[in-house]
Amino acid sequence: MADFSVFLGFLKQIPRCLSIFFTYLLFLQLWEVNSDKVWVLGPEESILARVGEAVEFPCRLSSYQDAEHMEIRWFRAQVSNVVYLYQEPQGRSSLQMAQFRNRTLFEAYDIAEGSVNLHILKVLPSDEGRYGCRFLSDNFSGEATWELEVAGSGSDPHISLQGFSGEGIQLQCSSSGWYPKPKVQWRGHQGQCLSPESEAITQNAQGLFSLETSVIVRGGAHSNVSCIIQNPLLPQKKEFVIQIADVFLPRMSPWKKAFVGTLVVLPLSLIVLTMLALRYFYKLRSFQEKQVKQGEEVREKLQTELDWRRSEGQAEWRAAQQYAADVTLDPATAHPSLEVSNNGKTVSSRLGVPSIAAGDPQRFSEQTCVLSRERFSSGRHYWEVHVGRRSRWFLGACLESVERSGPARLSPAAGYWVMGLWNRCEYFVLDPHRVALALRVPPRRIGVLLDYEAGKLSFFNVSDGSHIFSFTDTFSGALRAYLRPRAHDGSEHPDPMTICSLPVRGPQVLEENDNDNWLQPYEPLDPAWAVNEAVS
């Protein structure tokens, strides 16, 4: 009887098992369908453009597909507002919005791979808003959208003396050419905020803002006054400082007491006022001459400090060269769009994109980069990379264990210590946020020094021997040199990136010798190259 009860319980469980089995089959089918889905990728974050400059709108398909026969449309706010329309064999301008005519530049270098770019020239404040791009064919339609923010930094503020007002002197600060509406502040010599007497901000036909604001400075209150104007979208501000001697500030109380007397002796009062005015203008002239002299002294001091820092950076670069290492590139890690030379020193972009063997754990599938064969887990190592005249690149070092099957943020938190160039002149690092780098001389060759035990990775401009930037971190694994030539370089035949051959030296300390050419900043040997360097 007990066996019969067990058999009945087994029969009750059969429908439940079948339900789980069919649910599992349906999940596998849905996963297989979604795995082949293609979508459109645009900028991941809002784009900030400056007034009068150009801005780039990149757009691509999530997988390599030929988009040459597709309709590609950039639009504003809605699809019907056409910014640019690509339709084989060439873009059509009849549907283009009037404000964008003769201001767009279409790049189709990688259209066979599903990647295109649109440049909008001479950005205006009215260009601010939401944009998008759409790919359209007989069997596919997809789009991506993003925000464009526009910012304009106006002219340097100017403070003018408007005259005496009540119990003090009235100053006026003016500036123009700002977007969006700027913020303005008056501050005293101790940094305290001063309440403005008046403030007027106007907007011209081009959408740019001009401002005029005034403040009254009273006797004994401030030895100097500054006018500060800041753009809310840019991390910079413009400031003008004027110094006022207390003797020039009117004191109304004694004047009020003497008012009756001046009415009686009006001619004498006029003489006294004339003498005071002459004294005021004489003091003002002396003050201006003193300000000019002080400005020249400050400039000389800053130039001396700059020269000292430059010589200090060159000494650090010279010391780094004694740790020169023979670094070569590993073709097994290179992205399929890159080609590594036979000697392992040069990497360049190739036209065709070969297929990648499935499950290859060494090769990068998304990042167009390549790693070195050498692995560094101790000691100091120095190498140099010739970047030529490329307008975009990244280089540095990364952990050997970084993920290679998808995109990555090139910051120390993800295992990357690199610097980069964007749009020919924007040098920066991610530490962890974007940090802009100011370089006096555009580098054609970058030196990299890795001090593993000290947790330090430094970059040098070999063109003038100056120090650029240093990461300080704690390394937790083997590091490899990292090179990433950007595919969208902006030139038809961009220069390759090359790891330079350096004389490998022992650990001995180099002596200072200004006549040792090997230690001097890098100078090109090709006369034609040298001429181009001078022109640039």
Swiss-Prot record:
Localization (cell): Membrane
Protein name: Butyrophilin-like protein 9
Gene responsible for this protein: Btnl9
Glycosylation: residue positions: N102, N139, N224
Membrane topology annotation: Single-pass type I membrane protein
Extracellular-side positions: 36-257
Domain B30.2/SPRY: 307-506
Segments on the Cytoplasmic face: 279-536
Positions of disulphide bridges: C59-C133, C173-C227
Residue spans crossing the bilayer: 258-278
InterPro entries hit by this protein: B30.2/SPRY, B30.2/SPRY_sf, BTN3A2-like_Ig-C, Butyrophylin_SPRY, ConA-like_dom_sf, Ig-like_dom, Ig-like_dom_sf, Ig-like_fold
Keywords for this protein: Disulfide bond, Glycoprotein, Immunoglobulin domain, Membrane, Repeat, Signal, Transmembrane, Transmembrane helix
Pfam families reported for this sequence: C2-set_3 (PF22705), PRY (PF13765), SPRY (PF00622), V-set (PF07686)
Domain spans labelled Ig-like V-type: 36-149, 152-241
Family under the similarity heading: Belongs to the immunoglobulin superfamily. BTN/MOG family.
Gene3D superfamilies, per database record: 2.60.120.920, Immunoglobulins
Endpoints of the signal sequence: 1-35
Any Gene Ontology CC annotation: membrane
UniProt keyword annotation of Oxidoreductase present: no
PANTHER family assigned: BUTYROPHILIN, BUTYROPHILIN-LIKE PROTEIN 9
